UniProtKB/Swiss-Prot annotation:
This is 2,3,4,5-tetrahydropyridine-2,6-dicarboxylate N-succinyltransferase. One of its GO terms (cellular component) is cytoplasm. The gene is dapD. Pathway: Amino-acid biosynthesis; L-lysine biosynthesis via DAP pathway; LL-2,6-diaminopimelate from (S)-tetrahydrodipicolinate (succinylase route): step 1/3. Belongs to the transferase hexapeptide repeat family. It is found in: Cytoplasm. Keywords: Acyltransferase, Amino-acid biosynthesis, Cytoplasm, Diaminopimelate biosynthesis, Lysine biosynthesis, Repeat, Transferase.
Amino acid sequence: MSHADLARTIEAAWEDRASVGPTTQGTVREAVEAALALLDSGQARVAEKSGSADWQVNQWLKKAVLLSFRLNDMSVIPGGPGGAAWWDKVPSKFEGWDADRFRAAGFRAVPGAVVRRGSYIAPGAVLMPSFVNLGAYVGEGTMVDTWATIGSCAQVGKNCHISGGAGIAGVLEPLQANPVIIEDNCFIGARAEVAEGVIVGEGSVLSMGVYIGASTKIIDRATGEVMYGRVPPYSVVVSGTQPGKPLPDGTPGPSLYCAVIVKRVDAGTRAKTGINELLRD
């Protein structure tokens, strides 16, 4: 089936999803499995650039992921330490892989890396003990460091560094919600968190512990501009606070968290400058 045919079949199945279950066979199951295979191989993505700055979300692929949970029954997944097993609906991406398959895929996955089937890892990527959920996309040359999480349907570009313990949040529901997107050449600091469909523009640096969701104020220190949901390309971002409103009795109110763009750099500066130097005021 073409992508258009798959999309039509999955959209129709989604409208009648109450009737979809582990016993469902035929075109619905075939379409969902084909969609997951496209995601797993990188031939299709939940979100892709449609222009110089805009991202298009392929909602039918998110629906395929959700339908797969209805289609697939729970099963034992072997391979745990000490002969332990897991109990889940989604097998490992690496189930049945041998050395030739890993060499062909072209990325590194160290012991402790958990990658679910239906996610794509591009050649040259390095996965430390981390978690990559289904529907996610990890670009060429990207490092996913220890205990970092790439959530369901999250999109991470080329040559990024997702530092230890950082969270790139996933999104399956609500259905209309957009995935988190980390564009090419970004650095996400340790224990930082990007959630709720936020887009981090190309070449940006998020310092350790920066949290950005859809309602987080992102303030450009140089201009005073306040923005939401998108970090402009080549921004250097740190955690900050903004004065709160006075309390009813007139005393100062609590300060509120925000993310602060402390500087913007061009591509050449970003390529030549070390991360610590960029973050230094």
